[in-house]
From Swiss-Prot:
Species classification: Bacteria, Bacillati, Actinomycetota, Actinomycetes, Bifidobacteriales
Oligomeric form and interacting partners: Homodimer.
Primary role: Chaperone required for active expression of the lacto-N-biosidase LnbX.
GO cellular component: extracellular region
Organism: Bifidobacterium longum subsp. longum (strain ATCC 15707 / DSM 20219 / JCM 1217 / NCTC 11818 / E194b)
Subcellular location: Secreted
Keywords: Secreted, Signal
Record keyword Iron present: no
Keyword tRNA-binding among record annotations: no
Protein name stated in the entry: Chaperone for lacto-N-biosidase
Leader sequence residues: 1-37
Source organism, top-level taxon: Bacteria
Main localisation: secreted
């Protein structure tokens, strides 16, 4: 199957899975260290009310100037960065509450705590998130799954999906999964599809697993199955073991690709000022 067709199939699989997850609780096989458990959302992670709109209404003229941020050949758009700030806003508040016992939203985003400034921490965290996201898309570009890693292309694909779903629904067709996406839900949807397409193809780098590798990984972890006492035999969880191995290998590939995106020379001071303007 051509790679673009594999990616399209993965997109469809993610859409169907989204429907199933709403109605089913699946707990057949679990990884002993919790790898199969869905990650919980930390307290306050969804809170982004403290991030200003992208109109600059709460920022000074100087802080409203978004600096030029480039990852390789890709320019990071202002809207993309602001969305990343919103996504990491809750994590920043949680980190400073747990580490220093302060809430930046109340104590101030520009007040240093043992050398760490919440505003700068948040900006760095947002950039790290964007590095990982673009790394995943660049892997998809290498395999011909997407044309490029630009935010404009992502938005265009989202709009095409939304338009196609709306047209199908108006014609009486059945839309499996979400009928419409905002940018956050579409990013999650498409990044999952990219990962599924990559890990589902054994010919991709890092996805070929030897029997010895599978056995070693199985031996190093606990595997349980409903109705089975003790550790489940390898033959009964081999598929899950391989899936987990490929998932971890893919995540490591993304991490390595993200690390290769050099941000040393980014205009950090200007970015901090812009970020402070969003939090003002």
């Amino acid at each position: 199957m051509p790679r673009r067709h594999r990616f399209a199939a993965a997109i469809a699989a993610v859409a169907v899975a989204a429907v199933l997850l709403v109605t089913l609780t699946v707990a057949v096989v679990t990884h002993g260290d919790g790898a199969f458990a869905p990650a919980g959302t930390p307290a306050g992670a969804g809170a982004s009310a403290g991030i200003g709109s992208d109109t600059g209404s709460n920022a000074s003229e100087d802080s409203d100037m978004f600096p030029t941020i480039v990852f390789g050949d890709t320019v990071i758009e202002r809207k993309e960065y602001v969305a990343a700030l919103k996504a990491q806003h809750g994590a920043a508040r949680l980190y400073f509450r747990q580490t220093y016992g302060v809430d930046p939203a109340e104590d101030g985003w520009d007040k240093a705590h043992d050398g760490e400034v919440p505003c700068r921490w948040l900006a760095s965290r947002a950039i790290d998130e964007l590095r990982r996201r673009h790394a995943a898309y660049l892997i998809g570009v290498d395999l011909g799954q997407v044309a490029d890693d630009s935010y404009a292309s992502i938005v265009a694909r989202m709009e095409a999906v939304n338009s196609g779903n709306a047209e199908l629904k108006s014609d009486g067709g059945i839309v499996y999964g979400r009928t419409g996406f905002d940018i956050d839900s579409y990013l999650s949807y498409e990044l999952s599809a990219l990962k599924n397409a990559y890990t589902g193809d054994e010919s991709n780098p890092g996805m070929s697993l030897s029997d010895d590798e599978v056995r070693r990984y199985y031996d190093e972890h606990d595997w349980t199955k409903d109705g089975v006492d003790g550790k489940t035999p390898l033959d009964e969880v081999r598929g899950n073991v391989k899936a987990q191995m490929r998932s971890e290998r893919y995540d490591e590939l993304v991490s390595q690709r993200a690390e290769a995106i050099d941000v040393t020379d980014l205009p950090w001071d200007a970015l901090y000022r812009f970020t402070a303007g969003r939090l003002g």
